[in-house]
Amino acid sequence: MLSILIPVRDETENLDYIVKKFNENLQNIKHEVILVNDFSKDNTLEKAKEICKNKENYKVYNNQKKGLGGALNLGIKSSKGEYICIMMSDLSDDINDLKKYYEIIKKNQLDAVFGSRFIKSSKVYDYPLKKLILNRIFNTFVKFIFLKNYNDFTNAFKIYRSDVLKNLLPFFSESFNIFLEIPLKVMNRGYKYEVMPINWYNRKKGKTKFKIK
C-alpha cells in the first residue's frame, strides 16, 4: 500500500480539491492519504475531519509539536503503507508523477525516488522568477557543500520505502529544512535511490504557509 503524507496549515480552501484529485487519479492503487494539521489558524482541522469522516483510507491527525518537522514525524509514524510519498497541500506536483514514482520504486527495488524540476524532461510552469533564482542558488550551494549529485533538495515531493523513513526517525528539523535533512540522511546512510524528472505547477489557490528558513 502507498501512504501519501500531506502536512496542512490554513488550507481550508484547498481541502476539497486535494480529496477530489486523489479520488480521480488513484483508483487503481491501494493507498491511504494522511493529512496532518500543523497549527492552522483557520478551520482546516475541522473541515479535514468532516471531509474525511466517511473515507476509510483518509486519516487526519493534529500535530501537537508545532512545525513542519513535527507534522512529518507524526505522519511517518502513523503511516501503514509499505511506501510513503510526501506531498505539499497545494498539489503543485503532478499526481501522474506520483504514480510513476510508485512504479519505479517497486520495479527497481529502490529505497527512495527523488524528483527534480531541473533536469532534462522536467517541466516547470509559472515559477516566480525571484523564487526560482533563490532556489537555484540554494540548491547549488547544498549540492557542492555536501558533495551530492542532486539539484532539487527544496522540493518536498519524494517517495520512500516506509521502513527506511521509520529507521531514520526522529527528524530534528522543525521547519522547511526537513526537506534537506531527510534526503541527506538517505544518501549518507547508503540507501539506494534514483532521480527522475517531474512536472511542477505554481499553486492555484492561496499562498504557502510553510516558509523556508
Where are these regions (language model features)?
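Donor nucleotide-sugar binding loop of glycosyltransferases
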Residues: E11-N14, S40, L68, D94
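Cell-envelope/extracellular polymer assembly enzymes that use nucleotide-activated donors
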Residues: M1-S3, E32, E181
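Acceptor/aglycone-binding surface of glycosyltransferases and processive sugar-polymer synthases
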Residues: N63-S78, Y83-I86, I95-F176, N202-K213
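Short, well-formed alpha-helical segments that are part of the catalytic scaffolds
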Residues: E11-N25
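Acidic helix N-cap motif at the loop->helix transition within catalytic regions
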Residues: E13-Y17, D42-I51
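Conserved donor nucleotide-binding strand/loop of the catalytic core
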Residues: H31-I34, L45-S78
